[in-house]
Structures are given as structure tokens and as C-alpha cells.
Swiss-Prot record:
Described function: Skin-specific kinase that plays a key role in glycerol metabolism, catalyzing its phosphorylation to produce sn-glycerol 3-phosphate. Involved in skin-specific regulation of sterol regulatory element-binding protein (SREBP) processing and lipid biosynthesis.
Gene Ontology MF annotations: ATP binding; glycerol kinase activity
Reaction catalyzed: glycerol + ATP = sn-glycerol 3-phosphate + ADP + H(+)
GO biological process, one term: triglyceride metabolic process
Name of this chain's protein: Glycerol kinase 5
Organism: Gallus gallus (Chicken)
Keywords, alphabetical: ATP-binding, Cytoplasm, Glycerol metabolism, Kinase, Nucleotide-binding, Transferase
E.C. code: 2.7.1.30
Similarity field: Belongs to the FGGY kinase family.
Top EC class, one word: transferase
Source taxon at top rank: Eukaryota
Chain positions recorded as glycerol binding sites: 93, 270-271
Subcellular location: Cytoplasm
Length: 517
């Protein structure tokens, strides 16, 4: 029944709304009990670049887009908001904002996880004597106790993607935020917390375990905000929100927003949400998301593996007494790179890139190094093409870009195999770049694993909907969710990974040349 028609409120609430607030788009899907998409809406995220290396989002614009896509998707489904049983919200991680506790006024725009303003601070800390002392102390503690809780700080390094350093920057550079914090009047929130705060007109201030653990300020072993780290960085503990279950009744959206009070039944970080949407419920289940960034996640069950170079532990989700841990390896600028290649007219439509790459035997020695974080965690990595020749064509450039994605996938997968002591199952892929058959097949060849791609690659939206649906009773358990999964394509290894070794060795040399630019 179309939105707003008389009598539409009489229909039972049998639908769940899943919203994914990503780095490039805000998407909303309305799902029925069979997990079928009944209506959708999408808007482009408008990133701001006020200075070189800075990436921000206007909170009012993001709020307007968020509310807009929900209303549009429900209308597209021909439904009334009264028929929505639950709202689940998946959000990009580590993008944050601070605001005044009494007035609700932000002290600054959202600072994106892609923002590099803390690069100098990160480098200074990573080279500091204090951090070296911390490494020694916790290495000794781990040696004598065998407690893995001490392993993470023994190898602690800071990254520009983490919230911690950028939050420290805020209190050093925005006097209003610092003064409010000293008076216990400052609130910190990732995107989920801010949206919840706005939806409830300021009555609910909270986050969930998946979002909290992704900030780099939350201790996954103790499941609390890290007081030692906050003391080191002079960040007041009073700013942080309470942490709730991922699938949980967070309250209802104020009726002024959607016309009726819509139950908010899940908050979840986007990669953990995609993991849940892919039904990676068992230890050893592997999820590969290739969107704006690339993320490998392994379900490690109740085992929390400490950080290793290139990998870090996260809380996947908490539902009641169940806490599921993940190990993650990430790379940034996958989708961003492909969009850039389109903007400079290397191709017209992204769908043609796989065909372009296959039209030639190889990249003719051309290598592309995106400006993503490699194993050295170098924020000054230079994006570059290398090996260009007079015979180089657009096809060679496009193939080099796609190959770089597959090579980085191989690097991260090898680290996971080495460090995660759990037998790995079939890989499940999602995200926009998973629609590229060249990248998918090459990745399958390189890691020698079968990769499944679902019919709908918007797994973050589906995961948020699944979590909200469980909390509202629309679905009863995870076994029921598994039966709703639909696989569109399965990629199986077709070439021996050794055939790619010369090309990958050349690419790795190109990466080394681009470090510390």
C-alpha cells in the first residue's frame, strides 16, 4: 500500500529497514521476511576536503540524507512507516564527531576515517621513546604471564585510520571542545552514535560493541574504553558513550521524524554488519568486502587474537551473552581508485573494466600502486603508475589497477593464514568491486580458494536488517537467516598462483619505490 494512503496503518509490521551509511553512499533497503528487497533508495555521500589530506562530512547534510533515504525506500516499497517493525543502522567506522552535551551543537564536522590530519602526530608517537618503553614492558608481561591481553600493547602502533590520534588532535586544536570536555560537557560519537542521538532527539547516547571496538580506543579484551591510552593521549574518559549489544532495543525514533515512532533495533559497524549479512557465523568463516576500502575478516569465535602487523582484533557483534570476535586486515582506496580512473577517462563505465583487462595477455609490465596502507602502514605512500612504455594503452593501465587489488588481497590473505590459527572456510565476497569478475577470478587464483558472491552485494544493509530483525522477533535465530542466503556466482581457482609470481614480484618492487614519498 503506498505511503500515506488511508488505512495503511492497519497492516502488520512485517518489514525491516536496513540503512548503510558508507563512505561513498547512504543506502537504504526495505526487506520482507524472506529477506527480499521491497524498496530501495541511495544518495551520494558529500565528502568535504577543506585542506590537503583532510576529509570531513557535514553532519547536517548526512542527517538529511539518512532520513531522506529511509522515507524514499519505504515509499518505493509501497509501505507506510507503521509497517516497519525495526530499523537497523550500519555505519562507516572510526568517522567521528564531538558535540556539546547540553546544546547538542557539534564542535566540528565529522572527521572521516580517511582523514590524514593526524599523520605527523602518528609518526611522532610511533618513533617515540615512550612507545618503545611500553612495548618492552608489555612484552615482558606477556612473556611471564602468557596472557594475550598483554600482546596487543607490546606491538602497539598508531595509524591515521584510528580515531585515537584524530581525537587527540581535536582537543589540541579546537579550544571549545577542550573546554567543554574539562567541564564534562563534551560528547564523542561515531556516526551510529550521532544518528541515534538525533533520532531520539538527544534522549539516547550510546554505541554498540562493533563500532566501539573499531575506534582503536576501546579495549576488546576487557570490553571497555581504554583508560591507559586515553591518559597517554590526554583524552578525557567522560566523553565516551555507554556500549550496548549490537542487536538491541535502543529506543524509538521520535515520531516527528517519520510520523510514527520507529523502533531502532540494531547499531553495527559496516564490516561487521557485512560479515553478519554474509552469515559468517562460524569460526573460520571468511568475508572479503571490496568497496571504498578493502577488508578481510575472519570469524575467530570466542578467541581474540592480538594485533599483528597488518591485522587487528575486533568485536564482530554482541547478542546477549554471545560475543563473537573477528580478525581483520584492511586496505584503503579500492573503490576510490577505480572511481578516479573513471574520472580521468580511462573507461566510461565501470562494468567494462573486466573486459578491458581480459582483452590483453598481461599489463606489459605496468604496475599501479594505490595510495592505500600497505604492510608498512605508511601514510605517505605515493599513488603511482610505473613501467609505462610508448606501447602502453588504456587497457594496460586498467589491468594494472585491477591487478593491484588482487595482489593486495593475496598479501592480506597470506598474513591471515600465517597468523590466525583456525582452518579457513570458503571466502564470501561483497561490496561494489566484487562485481568485477576479473578481480574476483584473479583473487581466487592467487589465494587458491573458492569465493562466493551473493545475489545482492549490499551486505552491510542486509546485516543491519538481520540484526534488527532478530531483536524485533521478525526472525527467530541465525539458522533461519542462513536459509535466506542467495549465492549468485562461485569463483574457483583456474590458474596456479605461481603463474602470477613474476607480475606480483614486479608490483611489490613498485610498492617499495612508492613508500615514504
Amino acid at each position: 500500500m503506498p505511503c500515506g494512503q488511508p488505512g495503511s496503518g492497519a497492516a502488520p509490521a512485517l518489514y525491516v529497514v536496513g540503512v548503510d551509511v558508507g563512505s561513498t553512499t547512504v543506502k537504504c533497503h526495505v526487506y520482507d521476511r524472506a529477506a527480499g528487497v521491497r524498496g530501495s533508495s541511495c544518495r551520494k555521500v558529500e565528502s568535504l576536503y577543506p585542506r590537503p589530506g583532510w576529509v570531513e562530512l557535514d553532519p547536517e547534510v548526512l542527517w538529511s540524507q539518512f532520513v531522506g533515504v529511509i522515507k524514499e525506500a519505504v515509499q518505493a516499497a509501497g509501505l507506510h512507516m507503521r509497517q516497519v517493525a525495526a530499523l537497523g543502522i550500519s555505519t562507516q567506522r572510526s568517522t567521528f564527531i564531538t558535540w556539546h552535551k547540553r546544546t547538542g551543537k557539534p564542535f566540528h564536522n565529522f572527521i572521516s576515517w580517511q582523514d590524514l590530519r593526524s599523520a605527523e602526530l602518528v609518526n611522532s608517537w610511533n618513533r617515540s621513546l615512550l612507545l618503545k618503553v611500553i612495548h618492552v614492558i608489555f612484552t615482558v608481561l606477556h612473556f611471564f604471564t602468557g596472557n594475550d591481553r598483554y600482546l596487543a600493547p607490546s606491538v602497539l602502533t598508531f595509524s591515521t585510520q584510528q580515531t585515537s590520534m584524530k581525537l587527540s588532535w581535536v582537543f589540541k586544536n579546537i579550544p571549545e571542545a577542550d573546554e567543554a570536555a574539562k567541564k564534562n560537557n563534551c560528547c564523542f560519537g561515531t556516526v551510529d552514535t550521532w544518528l541515534l542521538y538525533r533520532l531520539t532527539k538527544g534522549s539516547v547516547f550510546a554505541t554498540d560493541y562493533s563500532n566501539a571496538s573499531s575506534t582503536g580506543v576501546f579495549e576488546p579484551f576487557t570490553k571497555c574504553w581504554n583508560p591507559t591510552l586515553c591518559h597517554l593521549l590526554s583524552i578525557p574518559m567522560s566523553i565516551y558513550p555507554p556500549v550496548k549489544d549490537t542487536s538491541f532495543n535502543f529506543g524509538s525514533a521520535d515520531s516527528e521524524i517519520f510520523g510514527v515512532p520507529v523502533p531502532i533495533m540494531a547499531l553495527v559497524a559496516d564490516q561487521q554488519s557485512a560479515m553478519f549479512g554474509e552469515c559468517c557465523f562460524q569460526p573460520g568463516d571468511v568475508k572479503l568486502t571490496m568497496g571504498t576500502g578493502g577488508f578481510w575478516n575472519v570469524n575467530t569465535g570466542g578467541n581474540l587474537f592480538a594485533s599483528h602487523k597488518g591485522l587487528y582484533p575486533l568485536i564482530g557483534w554482541k547478542i546477549g551473552e554471545e560475543v563473537v570476535y573477528l580478525t581483520e586486515g584492511s586496505m584503503s582506496n579500492i573503490g576510490t581508485t577505480i572511481k578516479w580512473a573513471q574520472d580521468i577517462n580511462l573507461f566510461t563505465n565501470v562494468d567494462e573494466t573486466a573486459k578491458m583487462a581480459r582483452s590483453i595477455v598481461d599489463s606489459q609490465g605496468v604496475c599501479f600502486v594505490p595510495g592505500f596502507q600497505v604492510s608498512a602502514n605508511d601514510p605517505y605512500l605515493c599513488a603511482s603508475f610505473m613501467g609505462l612504455k610508448p606501447t602502453t594503452t588504456r587497457n594496460h593501465l586498467v589491468r594494472a589497477i585491477l591487478e593491484s587489488v588482487a595482489f593486495r588481497n593475496k598479501q592480506l590473505f597470506d598474513i591471515i593464514v600465517k597468523k590466525v590459527r583456525i582452518p579457513l572456510q570458503t571466502v564470501r565476497a561483497d561490496g561494489g568491486v566484487s562485481n568485477n569478475s576479473f578481480v574476483m577470478q584473479m583473487t581466487s587464483d592467487l589465494i587458491n580458494k573458492k569465493i562466493e558472491k551473493p545475489s545482492n552485494t549490499d551486505m552491510s544493509s542486509l546485516g543491519a536488517a538481520f540484526l534488527a530483525g532478530l531483536a524485533s522477533g521478525l526472525w527467530t535465530d541465525k539458522e533461519q537467516l542462513k536459509k535466506l542466503r542467495q549465492i549468485e556466482t562461485v569463483f574457483e581457482p583456474q590458474k596456479d598462483e605461481k603463474e602470477y609470481k613474476p607480475a606480483m614480484d614486479t608490483w611489490m618492487r613498485a610498492v617499495k619505490c612508492s613508500l615514504h614519498w
